[in-house]
């Protein structure tokens, strides 16, 4: 491949055309996954009858079924939906199940004394949740959520199976004009690595900050 071909593949096809779609897919899916995870995590953490069991089955399905099959199933069901919207929904459902377990674990880790104190003060359950419990959960769960975002970013490549024009699909199409698979997919690998590595570093710094500055300060005050 000539230098001009490298420019076309990297800048014109991947960076200018495919990367914006991929970033929109990441943003949409992460927001959707966080909403599913937060609502479901609260229900699971509070052990709401029936709903908690239903969500437990949903989590097990998402854990036990390959991501690609989830997207292909939604693609077959939502015949009038765009590939982008189906990809956002599918990835949101998949990642939301994992975030749900993170939030659930955070809620269950909150000291029972705080629940009892809130009950003694006759605080409504929604006040207890959103003023006392959820802020603590989000603080502790933030590094784990960053880690889940890294997995979500890597998982967006599965959207290529339903024709969503993210980076992997664009690279597959580019192969028809540029036969050097090592270069084309190598550029995709580099872009994904940069995004995931940057978030991994951020997650480690956040985890260190939470442990040293926030949790550490609380223990000192106690």
Predicted regions and their residues:
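Transmembrane alpha-helices and adjacent helix-loop boundaries
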Residues: 1-222
């Amino acid at each position: 491949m000539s230098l001009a071909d490298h420019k076309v593949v990297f800048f014109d096809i991947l960076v200018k055309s495919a990367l914006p779609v991929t970033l929109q897919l990441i943003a949409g899916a992460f927001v959707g996954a966080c909403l599913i995870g937060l609502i479901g995590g609260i229900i699971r953490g509070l052990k709401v009858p029936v709903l908690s069991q239903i969500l437990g089955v949903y989590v097990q399905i998402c854990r036990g079924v390959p991501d690609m099959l989830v997207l292909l199933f939604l693609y077959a069901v939502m015949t009038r939906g765009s590939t982008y919207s189906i990809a956002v929904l599918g990835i949101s459902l998949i990642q939301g199940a994992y975030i749900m377990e993170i939030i659930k674990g955070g809620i269950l880790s909150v000291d029972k004394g705080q629940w009892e104190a809130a009950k003694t003060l006759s605080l409504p359950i929604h006040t207890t949740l959103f003023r006392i419990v959820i802020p603590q959960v989000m603080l502790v769960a933030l590094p784990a959520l960053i880690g889940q975002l890294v997995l979500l970013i890597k998982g967006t490549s599965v959207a290529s199976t339903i024709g969503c024009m993210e980076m992997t699909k664009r690279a597959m199409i580019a192969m028809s004009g540029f036969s050097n698979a090592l270069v084309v997919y190598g550029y995709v690998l580099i872009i994904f690595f940069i995004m995931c590595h940057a978030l991994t570093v951020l997650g480690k710094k956040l985890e260190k900050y939470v442990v040293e500055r926030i949790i550490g300060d609380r223990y000192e005050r106690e």
